[in-house]
Amino acid sequence: MATIYKGLTLDKFQEDAIAAMENNESVVVSAPTGSGKTLTADYIIDKYLKQKKRIVYTAPIKALSNQKYKDFSLEYGASNIGLMTGDIVINPTAQILIMTTEIYRNMVMTGDESVKDIAYVVFDEVHYINDIDRGTVWEESIIYSPDSVRFLCLSATIPNAEEFAAWISAIKHHKVKTVKSDTRAVPLTHMFYDFELGITDLNKLNKHLKAVKDMPSYDNVFKKRGRGRNGRNQRLTQPQPDHIDLIKRLGPDKVPCLFFSFSRRDCQEKARQLAKTNIFKAVPEIIKICQEHIKNWPTEVKKLPTTALLRVSLAKGIGFHHAGLLPMLKELVEELFSKGLIKVLYTTETFAVGINMPAKTVCFNALRKYDGRSFRGLNTKEYFQIAGRAGRRGIDKEGLVVSMVYRQTFRYKELKLLTDKDILPIQSQFKLSVNTTLNLIDKHSKEEIEHILRLSFYSYQKFGDKYADVETRRILYRYNRIRKKLERAGFLDPKNHTLTEKGKFSTKIFVDEIILGEIFASEIYKKFNDCQTLLLIAALCYEPRERTKFKKVFPNSDYRKLKALIAEDPITAKEPKFENLKDVTAMTVPIIEGGDFFTILNNTNLLEGDLIRFYGQILDRINQLRKASFEHTLTNKMDCVEGILKRALEGIYLV
């Protein structure tokens, strides 16, 4: 007899996961996007909420943490739910705590007392362990969790789920169940859009392009690019696919459509272009909802160019959504989309992770993206994470996925592999950080540290392999290099292998550990006034980009004195991030002088959401310094600087 939960008939993989959790086992759930994995998380929350035990729900990005906080608050009552994302802390003693994975990792790494009360940790989107920059966070979260904690690991389809589960079982010494499903509730149809053929399948497209006589080869396009005007012109004269024509060809029965672009500005520009057409008419219901929201917004928000564009496009059921938007704008878009009033939503890939709002159709503007290092093709996990948003369970018989094709970069075999199925395994990205090293030294003997460093997923994957010892030696070599660096900086006493006061301080600092420990665990910070303190922390958070512009900077006397003080210390004098101090004055000095968020925004071309993210990082750093502090003087200074910053963000900085 089928099991019913929350009015839904459970699939077998959901039943199996629940049975394992009832046996106090950890569970790795591998299933396609949109298949109902999160229902297993709902079950474990229901179970332990009744038993008065604590649950932690971790998410890879803030958007998903915020979404879960709202959903769970409605489902279980706000008093039972807490949120911790670094810069925002709400109800931290709640029975159900939602947080980014980094926050949980920091808690277990520093030996936070509250971790002892946790019964279950839900790792949503655990396949993020593949992330080159952040994957180590998931490994460390599992390695350093108490043995009493059980895990529910939710992942998109991964071929080596059993191996991952076996690793957890081996290092945590309890049974871990693997539950897999390869079946989507709503099957996907993968199609392509060509400027000449329109929407077609891959085989027909390949056959057609083979017959095109002047079809440029993939390699020749990039060889010719930049070799003079003629080569560049030849690339540009190749007709490009048109998103408006694609929307026309989809027709009214294939919307709502999520149209993914990997550029925030491109999302807005495409929405503007589509809104100029007559494909969609103005919808009175949308206009009314927009008016109800906007009337409560600050005057400055109403005047933003982004707000003006959003009002015009939303009126026709066309929207855009990305991390560069103010939270209140995103909330309006999400409400309209959830009500089925938006026909086409141009969005970045964060929507595929952070918001559980599927559509009938998913379109890709391109199958390449910039990953922070270079432009590259999507891997299968990235493709299916986004494509999986196509098809609404109980509404659509199939989900349609359409990728725009650029002939000059067309490769049949690559596209065939990409769209066939998600075959990318999860792999270890373990990297030893300064903070991890500090906490290992603080809590363990040399022998224990060497044992712990052998617990990485990579070491397990390579067990018995000739490269296993090579990897272990590499990690130990990295550990010894960091240890010597800490000794030179005065964070570690080499005689007795114990942390100094600066080292103890920085066990609770998770970025720029040595610089912040050098300044704030000593007398140096006492030389700084509030403006200089804010400027210094901001400089460490700022990530300069070539396109970022400021109309005016403010290299005042506080700035000049801070530069001089930084130059006096041999450690701070070498920090390259302080080269950005002059630019950072544009985002800090006006705040000290009484300006607000919009004062800063009018002085830069940064998107509103990017500026909020920057200030959020500063608040997170302030929280870390406050928690690490040994004395009231520093705590009071952090309270003061935080108060100044929050005043400037009043009415803007929202969950």
Model-derived features: positions:
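SF2 helicase catalytic motif II
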Residues: 97, 101-104, 109-152
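Conserved pre-motif I regulatory segment
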Residues: 1-30
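Conserved interdomain linker/interface between the two RecA-like ATPase lobes of SF2 helicase motors
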Residues: 143, 150-152, 157-169, 173-273, ...
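Conserved C-terminal RecA-like helicase domain
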Residues: 54-58, 65-69, 73-83, 260, ...
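C-terminal accessory/connector segments of nucleic-acid motor ATPases
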Residues: 328-337, 427-536
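Conserved segment of the helicase C-terminal RecA-like domain
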Residues: 149-150, 357, 361-371, 375-417
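Inter-Walker segment of RecA-like/P-loop motor cores
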Residues: 73-112, 180-186, 190-193
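Motif I (Walker A/P-loop) of helicase-class P-loop NTPases
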Residues: 37-46, 134-139
